[in-house]
């Protein structure tokens, strides 16, 4: 194990701890001012759930809770990038682009939801097109950073190590599609997970920590150092956000936070060629998104529901399990997924 992390010496680990600490304390310090500002702007959660009267009734106590708290993630992550990453590197500005683009998309969606008063943001098609554009720009930029490196056409397969996907046009096309699915899919999956107090922030800590281990165990990746710094900050701000987002939540991250987190996590996985590992590390996100896909597919094809309600966490709410118990059980599942993902990544 020590040889795996030999490239990252004690001073580097100290730097990552510093990044984590700064992100954590900055999030704690800015939390209350941001919440107060959101309240003044009337950024309150819209509890209206069309065709989901029971869910609306279950969440009535959340109607006076401000949302769009994900702006904290934007502030802290941008601060981290400008403090710790060299401004002369293309990768630095790629992270700036990721944070601003995903954060802006989420913020705009939250604004539209607020104005329409019905809990509906921009249409699914509009959001999907914007996500594809952001992801395509990200992938092309990553390709230019790798500059034709052999590592660009590799893939970390769980329990099998790094394998080549080929340098042919077909291989590169496969890479592009997989990368696109990873970024867009993770962004939407985290967005779907953000439905209970503390659920998305807590599971983000685990997935990001697992991905950080992947970065530290693959020092030859061109972006491993930059990714490890950003992930350390993401873990720090996620922990800090839990102070205000755990039950009973004082603020919700909204799409501003969930789309940003998913976009950054997915992009970091692509930078590390760890798209398949993220399926394990973010197992909770996969289950949440999968439950929605299965539910929609079953309703359209069979005219029957598989779950009482989707995403998955609402299914358990419908069964009468308290919100805090559902979150606790999903935390346990997230921890197990993280451990399994780390083992799969380090298995040589």
From Swiss-Prot:
The pathway that the record names for this protein is: Cell wall biogenesis; peptidoglycan biosynthesis
Q: State its cofactor.
A: Mg(2+)
Q: Where does the protein end up?
A: Cell inner membrane
* UniProt keywords, alphabetically: Cell cycle, Cell division, Cell inner membrane, Cell membrane, Cell shape, Cell wall biogenesis/degradation, Magnesium, Membrane, Metal-binding, Peptidoglycan synthesis, Transferase, Transmembrane, Transmembrane helix
Question: Can the keyword Hydrolase be found in this entry's annotation?
Answer: no
Q: Name any one Pfam family assigned in the record.
A: Glycos_transf_4
Q: What is its EC number?
A: 2.7.8.13
Q: Name one GO molecular function term.
A: phospho-N-acetylmuramoyl-pentapeptide-transferase activity
Main subcellular location of this protein, as a coarse class: membrane
HAMAP family attached here?
MraY
Q: What is this protein called?
A: Phospho-N-acetylmuramoyl-pentapeptide-transferase
Q: Which organism was this protein described from?
A: Chlamydia caviae (strain ATCC VR-813 / DSM 19441 / 03DC25 / GPIC)
């Amino acid at each position: 194990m020590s040889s795996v992390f030999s490239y990252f010496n004690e001073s580097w680990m100290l730097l990552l701890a510093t990044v984590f600490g700064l992100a954590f304390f900055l999030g704690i310090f800015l939390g209350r001012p941001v919440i107060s500002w959101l309240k003044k702007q009337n950024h309150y959660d819209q509890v209206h759930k069309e065709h989901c009267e029971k869910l609306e009734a279950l969440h009535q106590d959340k109607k006076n809770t401000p949302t769009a708290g994900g702006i904290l993630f934007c502030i802290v992550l941008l601060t981290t990038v400008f403090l710790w990453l060299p401004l002369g590197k293309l990768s630095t500005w790629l992270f700036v682009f990721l944070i601003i683009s995903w954060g802006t998309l989420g913020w705009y969606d939250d604004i539209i939801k607020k104005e329409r008063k019905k809990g509906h943001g921009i249409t699914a098609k509009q959001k999907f097109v914007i996500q594809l554009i952001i992801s395509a720009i990200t992938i092309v930029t990553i390709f230019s950073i790798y500059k034709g490196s052999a590592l660009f056409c590799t893939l970390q397969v769980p329990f099998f190590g790094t394998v080549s996907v080929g340098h042919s046009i077909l291989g590169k096309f496969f890479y592009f599609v997989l990368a696109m699915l990873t970024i867009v899919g993770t962004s939407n999956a985290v967005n779907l997970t953000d439905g209970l107090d503390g659920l998305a922030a807590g599971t983000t800590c685990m997935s990001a920590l697992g991905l950080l281990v992947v970065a530290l165990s693959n020092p030859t990746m061109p972006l491993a150092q930059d990714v490890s710094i950003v992930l350390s900050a993401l873990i720090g701000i996620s922990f800090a956000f839990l102070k205000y987002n755990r039950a009973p939540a004082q603020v919700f991250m909204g799409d501003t936070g969930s789309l940003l987190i998913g976009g950054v996590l997915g992009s970091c996985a692509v930078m590390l060629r760890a798209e398949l590992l993220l399926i394990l590390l973010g197992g909770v996100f996969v289950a949440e998104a999968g439950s929605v896909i299965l539910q929609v597919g079953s309703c359209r094809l069979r005219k029957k529901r598989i779950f009482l309600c989707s995403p998955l966490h609402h299914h358990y709410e419908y069964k009468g399990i308290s919100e805090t118990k559902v979150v606790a059980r999903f935390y346990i599942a997230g921890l197990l997924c993280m451990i399994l993902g780390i083992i799969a990544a380090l298995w040589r």
